[in-house]
């Protein structure tokens, strides 16, 4: 590829990146606010405290949001990807093949689990970061890469600020433009043979290694191939030197993006997070927490914060104290309180907003998972069903956009590294399905289990009421009323087979009873014949 083609290709990708960035630009102010409120390093303000000498200290505002995010990640992990639970399996859709070769798929499935949760894997750490990003920003990008030395798939949740993305007509994200800024030294770790144009031209003859510490911008483009269906173009571009470092065609995309939810009236590929819906409440909580701390200071020490209130009243919108003049025995200004804050009301507001954040991020539900008090099996079933239904909207989307593609990508990468257990030759070209079976999905199925239990209780009561009820028709009616899954009911053919089996069993029972009667009659006749013979002998 000559320099003109390179420039043309780089210009095309730059234009495409700018277009995708314009779609993301509207979200950037919101992302900044979320980062400030969800990151404890940014959730500080400064107050003045008089204790002998006046010193500058930092006090933290309410950190409910930041502290709830790890708990939310734990909730999602326990319901979607728990380490101690086999949350997916692989099966052949053909029942005969599954019965004969299903154990080979089970070995493959077990291999994936062992690799994913081994000591060399960072899967759990990556998923924890992913769930927090999903809750805070509404979307995430997971990168899968190959560790050829250990034949291990590596996982990493990347910062969303590095990406602009686009989705296809089915609503799946399949286009990634990732921009990373670092030094050429970092770039050489990924591409050891690459040297930028200015180095090749001899710009650094006096100091041959000086260019390694210069900053550069790397653009990585991954998008569906325009020439081959099912393939992806992967292009690495040095935007500082305006050179294409590498251009390859890959059988898969190593990035996976998903969203918490999306706006139905827009075409934007970026997600809408649970925290976005309560962002005004979170901001108010931090403001009220500041007011509560300030009111507490005024109630305990009237001289505290007086300087802030008088010198910078615009920062707080009100003046709560005034200096009367003069100093006390310790050299502090005399202060009079103009308006005392209502601390119980402020405290109530803080608690209300804290509860709103916890409810939004399912934290209270996570705490109920840790409850140790005894409960009945029915109560436990209903509680598990409730948790599954609450998380279902977000969990179903994660399963569809993340977990299913991730498992397929894991299998493809392990196959490339020749690490998977081998299949039999008879299975070449056969198709198998990946079935998700995590605690969330099982909790949703408890609706049907509970309905089946209620149907059994009702049917038992009906049988005791009146003999005029037709039990078979009653079963059909109750199954329809309780919405029992058809999979647990007999089909018409199965019903006919059961009736035929019952009829045959009845006929066999009748034949056995008849045979018993005939045998008893023969025995009686035999006994009668013996008795008659004895009588004749006596008469003779």
Predicted features and spans:
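Short, well-ordered loop/turn elements at secondary-structure boundaries
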Residues: 135-138, 213, 230-231, 318, ...
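Extended, helix-rich architectural segments
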Residues: 1-200
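Structured, contiguous alpha/beta core segments that scaffold functional sites
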Residues: 2, 6-14, 18-21, 146-318
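Generic recognition of flexible, low-complexity loop/linker segments
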Residues: 126-131, 205-208, 221-223, 463-465
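C-terminal anchoring/interaction modules
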Residues: 1-22, 30, 47, 304-540
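Long, contiguous amphipathic alpha-helices that act as assembly "spine/axial" helices in icosahedral shell
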Residues: 101-146, 270-304, 338-371, 380-414
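Alpha-helical structural motif
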Residues: 12, 26, 67, 72, ...
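Short, hydrophobic/amphipathic alpha-helical patches that form generic packing surfaces
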Residues: 70-78, 276-294, 457, 473-480
